[in-house]
Curated annotation (Swiss-Prot):
First and last residues of each zinc finger (B box-type): 181-221
GO biological process: protein ubiquitination; regulation of postsynapse assembly
Alphabetical list of Pfam families matching this protein: zf-B_box (PF00643), zf-RING_UBOX (PF13445)
Source organism (scientific name): Mus musculus
Alphabetically ordered keywords of this record: Coiled coil, Cytoplasm, Metal-binding, Methylation, Nucleus, Phosphoprotein, Transferase, Ubl conjugation pathway, Zinc, Zinc-finger
Cell compartment(s), UniProt: Cytoplasm; Nucleus
Protein known as: E3 ubiquitin-protein ligase TRIM47
Chain spans, region Disordered: 81-123, 396-416
InterPro entries according to UniProt: B30.2/SPRY, B30.2/SPRY_sf, ConA-like_dom_sf, E3_ubiq-ligase_TRIM/RNF, TRIM47_SPRY_PRY, Znf-RING_euk, Znf_B-box, Znf_RING
KW Cell cycle (keyword) present: no
Pathway: Protein modification; protein ubiquitination
Main location: cytoplasm
Length: 641
């Protein structure tokens, strides 16, 4: 009767509508059962007033059994109708006899292991809601003991009895209770996931196995799980190690973010203060210039206006005397002589020439002075802006940033960096170094991202523009700037050099100029089998220290310094700290008689004009080193911070 598929009603032979799951596990339409059971009670099997029975297996059920909709099966039916065309979307007709039966019909189940007997209700953790039986009355459902992937329902121990007694139900696959049964079904075919493809590493149903994965290595899920459980501890350990590394990286990134934010806030405050001072200086200069103009204007204007008044008064007197002379009668000789004398006296008062215009106005030079200041300011701003962006030379540009500020902020830190100090102090600046395989020379064999060894046979690495071609060297990933960084290296065997190299240094340089410390773009600490020495710009400075298998490197970018330490028993002993000496007030350098220090004084600061990378040179044929040991101890410190 159920030849049309497990998602069809055995009564109407159409796709299930409001599916109901009986305690025996069979599914029917709610309307079909409602129409069938009154008829069977009246005259069907069991006789009038007899118990209702399953139309398929004739399992009797007590009177008053409440029929409840199977919501999980209903959701699966909606998913199947919306995504996969098939028999469910086609209307039932009389020709269904010739249709291909659904492969996953309960009447022809795929081979499966022997079903286990119904078990006691699952013991659920405290506070977690157990999966309820789908066949129990609503509101009184017991915890499910098993879930049936064929019936798409979960059953308690009592309602699992039909799966034990009925031969048609014994082939159903029973699994521990599942809260979402659809997750154990193929989303494409809505069949139980029973196989595992090792080629594509996915779980499959039988239909997927026969259609899309022919020729692949397929195994039962239980077999693959048993195999994977053996590898589980290794995977968990690797995940834990990776999480520890990420934790260290996160701590370091957080320190970097905090450093950037605090540095930006402090720099903004300093810049704002300096701009305010510069603005105040310009405002004061403007007031002085404007006052000078006003003072010059008042002085010269007062003198010119006084001359103007005197000339106007003299002209007025001459005009009056001339007029009076013209009014004298011809017969009045006395008046004539008096008025003529008055006119002559008026002429004698201002017989000299009047003051001419000034040859030069002194305050008119103010604009020239201000223009010179403006041009100088514009030029200085443009030049310093180029220096700030890194477009100009460092010698005539910006001053070294923050050297005095760093020392004044934490005087104890400098003393720790220049003497013996506990290792925990440096772990605050721990930097996780990963070797960059794209830079490794062909005679270097990498072990993950932490180990490297020189070999005799070349390794066929892929071509890379950053790969060293003439020197057995390798760089670390990432470029360093604007901070303090610390990492450690274990010298396992051979001649090894450890240091830093400028990011833009060409890896195709010849052997004599491309080696670490043999140019102005790198510096290093070398162990040559007999003792330690430091190299920079082609000069070597031997160090009187015994061999230490673990070497610490501390890059102080803000202070333009690089320090090397011997790590023993949780303490660090300074081997050498490379830094340019400060010039004395007379202009002489601190150590003019030391050629190596003189070379540092003249060229070492230029190394910090670039971003720097950790660098490693394996000089002898048996050289071998390992990055570390910044492991659990370092991670613990970083996590505490």
């Amino acid at each position: 009767m159920d030849g049309s598929g497990p998602f069809s009603c055995p009564i109407c032979l159409e796709p299930l509508r409001e599916p109901v799951t009986l305690p025996c596990g069979h599914n029917f339409c709610l309307a079909c059962l409602g129409a069938l059971w009154p008829h069977r009670s009246a005259g069907g099997t069991g006789g009038s007033g007899g118990p209702a029975r399953c139309p398929l297996c004739q399992e009797p059920f007590p009177d008053g059994l409440q029929l409840r909709k199977n919501h999980t099966l209903s959701e699966l039916l909606q998913l199947r109708q919306g995504s996969v065309p098939g028999p469910m979307s086609a209307p039932a007709s009389g020709s269904t006899r010739g249709a291909t039966p659904e492969p996953s019909a309960p009447s022809a189940p795929p081979p499966a292991p022997e079903p286990s007997a119904p078990c006691a209700p699952e013991q659920w953790p405290a506070g977690e809601e157990p999966v309820r039986c789908d066949a129990c009355p609503e509101g009184a459902a017991l915890p499910a003991a098993l879930s049936c992937l064929s019936c798409l329902a979960s059953f308690c121990s009592a309602h699992l009895a039909p799966h034990e007694r009925s031969p048609a139900l014994r082939g159903h696959r029973l699994v521990p209770p599942l809260r979402r049964l659809e997750e154990s079904l193929c989303p494409r075919h809505l069949r139980p996931l029973e196989r595992y493809c090792r080629v594509e590493r996915v779980c499959l149903c039988e239909a997927c196995a026969t259609q899309d994965h022919r020729g692949h290595e397929l195994v039962p899920l239980e077999q693959e799980r048993a195999l994977q459980e053996v590898e589980q501890s290794k995977v968990l350990s690797a995940a834990e190690d990776r999480m520890d590394e990420l934790g260290a990286g996160i701590a370091q990134s957080r320190r970097t973010v905090a450093l950037i934010k605090s540095a930006a806030v402090a720099e903004r405050e300093r810049v704002s203060q300096m701009f305010a001072e510069a603005t105040a200086t310009l405002q004061s200069f403007q007031n002085e210039v404007m006052g000078f103009i006003e003072e010059g204007e008042a002085t010269m204007l007062g003198r010119s206006q006084g001359d103007l008044r005197r000339q106007e008064e003299q002209r007025s007197r001459l005009s009056k005397a001339r007029h009076n002379l013209g009014q004298v009668p011809e017969a009045d000789s006395v008046s004539f002589l008096q008025e003529l004398l008055a006119l002559r006296l008026a002429l004698e008062e201002g017989c000299g020439p009047g003051p001419g215009p000034p040859r030069e106005l002194s305050f008119t030079k103010s604009s020239q002075v201000v223009k010179a200041v403006r041009d100088t300011l514009i030029s200085a701003c443009a030049s310093q802006w180029e220096q700030l962006r890194g477009l100009g030379s460092n010698e005539d540009g910006l001053q070294k940033l923050g050297s005095e500020d760093v020392e004044s902020q934490d005087p104890d830190s400098t003393s720790l960096l220049e003497s013996e100090a506990p290792r925990d102090y440096f772990l605050k600046f721990a930097y996780i170094v990963d070797l960059d395989s794209d830079t490794a020379d062909k005679f270097l064999q990498l072990f993950g991202t932490k180990g490297v060894k020189r070999v005799l046979c070349p390794i066929n690495y892929p071509e890379s523009p950053t790969r060293f071609t003439h020197c057995e060297q390798v760089l670390g990933e990432g470029a360093l700037d604007r901070g303090t960084y610390y990492w450690e290296v274990e010298i396992i065997e051979g001649w090894v050099s450890v240091g830093v190299m400028a990011e833009g240094f060409s890896p195709q340089e010849p052997y004599d100029r491309g080696r670490l410390g043999r140019n102005a773009h790198s510096c290093c600490l070398q162990w040559n089998g007999r003792g330690f020495s430091v190299w920079f710009c082609g000069l070597e400075a031997p160090l009187p220290h015994a061999f230490s298998p673990t070497v610490g490197v501390c890059l102080e970018y803000a202070d333009h310094a690089l320090a090397f330490y011997a790590v023993r028993d949780g303490k660090l002993s300074l081997l050498r700290r490379l830094k340019a000496s400060r010039p004395r007030r007379s202009g002489a350098l601190a150590s003019p008689t030391d050629p190596f220090q003189s070379r540092l004084d003249s060229h070492f600061s230029g190394l910090f004009n670039h971003r720097l990378k950790p660098a490693f040179f394996l000089e002898s044929v048996d050289a071998h080193l390992q990055i570390g040991p910044l492991k659990k101890s370092c991670i613990t410190v970083l996590k505490r911070r």
